[in-house]
Amino acid sequence: MEIEVNETYRAQFCVIGGGMAGRCAAVAGARRGVKTALVQDRPVLGGNASGEVRMWIRGAGHHFPFYREGGIVEELAMANIRYNPTLSFGVWDGVLYDLAAGEKNLKVFLNATCTGAKEENGRILYADIWQLTTYKKLRIFAEYFADCSGDSILSYCTSAAFTSGREDKARYGEKDGVSAADGCTMGSSCLIQVRETAEKVPFTPPSFARKLTEEEFRYRMDTNSRGVFRTDNFWWMELGGAKDVTRDAEEIKTELLALAYGVWDYIKNSGKFDSDNWTLDWVSFLGGKRESRRVVGEYVLRQDDLVSGRH
């Protein structure tokens, strides 16, 4: 039996995906007087930058302070300093939510995922949304839609063109590209955070943890520096690039969790690190994707755009 639509919502602008790109797009639209709907399939906003994944917004600004993002992203950073001086990720989620839900022209739908869309004459009329927490099927009508979902789910549900993997070097004249196109992408990560305590803390790994050898580990962390793990965010725990990052997401996450617990097991129990007083404080059970489907727009960014320096 097909589930009937429980509610409809009419907006001028509908953004699918509440990561940083979608959140900023929705806020920008709302501030310009546009009635906007923001649809996010997680309970929090921010995507990879949320408390669920915990990858800070950095980029070139990490190395060159004057290269960092301005605009709404800088506004978020300033608000975070004011409301979250200890840089708690849980409080950061609240900052992200406050600076969206507080916009009078913006309606935020959390725990809501796009399941389909209706097109007519090359335009999207509405998107169908399933909200997990309320078990409601919502239908959002809008004049304009933005696919900021990361997995390009709106494009997948419509006739919009999208691609994934690596193009061959001849397609866009990229000299450092691969000779033949393939499905390889950047991988995903389940990050961990560790914390120092006042006394020794043992660690017993779960049964699913992967056992790592010194040979495997030495290429990722300098075992000659016994305290190096203290300032590491473990971004290098990356898997899945040779698999389908969307269809195989749960399988990849399972492997990542085994790796994450295995890495901490090695740090705690190998004797190679000064980690006696350190404890595992948090593990992400949501794989943070570096890459997925890519919507094909009016212009495709290519290697020459980045290396030529003309911009």
Over which residues does each language-model region extend?
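A generic local structural motif
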Residues: 1-3, 131-134
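Flavin (FAD/FMN)-binding glycine-rich loop and adjacent Rossmann-like elements that form
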Residues: 48, 111, 123-126, 133-311
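Conserved N-terminal/central alpha/beta ligand/cofactor-binding core
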Residues: 2, 6-10, 28-35, 39-123, ...
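Residue-level signal for short segments within beta-strands and strand-turn junctions
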Residues: 40, 129-131
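Short, charged helix-to-loop "capping" segments that act as catalytic/coupling loops
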Residues: 103-106, 132-136
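Short glycine/serine/threonine-rich phosphate/pyrophosphate-binding segments
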Residues: 22-25
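Glycine-rich Rossmann-fold phosphate-binding loop(s) that bind the pyrophosphate
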Residues: 17-20
